Swiss-Prot record:
Keywords: Oxidoreductase. Belongs to the ferredoxin thioredoxin reductase alpha subunit family. This is Ferredoxin-thioredoxin reductase, variable chain. The keyword Oxidoreductase applies. PANTHER family: FERREDOXIN-THIOREDOXIN REDUCTASE SUBUNIT A1, CHLOROPLASTIC (PTHR46937:SF4), FERREDOXIN-THIOREDOXIN REDUCTASE, VARIABLE CHAIN (PTHR46937). InterPro entries: Elect_transpt_acc-like_dom_sf (IPR008990), Fd_thioredoxin_Rdtase_alpha (IPR004207), FTRV (IPR044166). GO terms for molecular function: oxidoreductase activity. GO terms for biological process: photosynthesis. Residues 43-46 are annotated as: Interaction with ferredoxin. Variable subunit of the ferredoxin-thioredoxin reductase (FTR), which catalyzes the two-electron reduction of thioredoxins by the electrons provided by reduced ferredoxin. The lineage of its organism: Bacteria, Bacillati, Cyanobacteriota, Cyanophyceae, Synechococcales. SUPFAM superfamilies: Electron transport accessory proteins.
Length: 73
């Protein structure tokens, strides 16, 4: 997976920060978005992020996900 790829969430991932469902459980399963960034370094130093893929679902909503939770469309 690379930056700019269209992806779909294939696992059940519950988030509480969705702008339309603030502070309520919202399942991202089958949601489609675009990989905005892959986090491998911070301030020039390598990092091992637990959720390295930043996926943008809309202008207002982005989420950090793992590779096994996503599939390329």
């Amino acid at each position: 997976m690379n930056v700019g790829d269209r992806v779909r969430v294939k696992e059940s991932v519950v988030v509480y920060h969705h702008p339309d469902h603030r502070n309520q459980a919202f399942d991202l399963k089958d949601a489609e978005g675009e990989i905005a960034a892959i986090l491998t370094e911070w301030n020039g130093k390598p990092i091992s992020a637990n959720f390295p893929y930043l996926v943008s679902f809309s202008n207002k909503f982005r989420a950090h996900l793992r590779d096994f939770e996503l599939e390329v469309i």
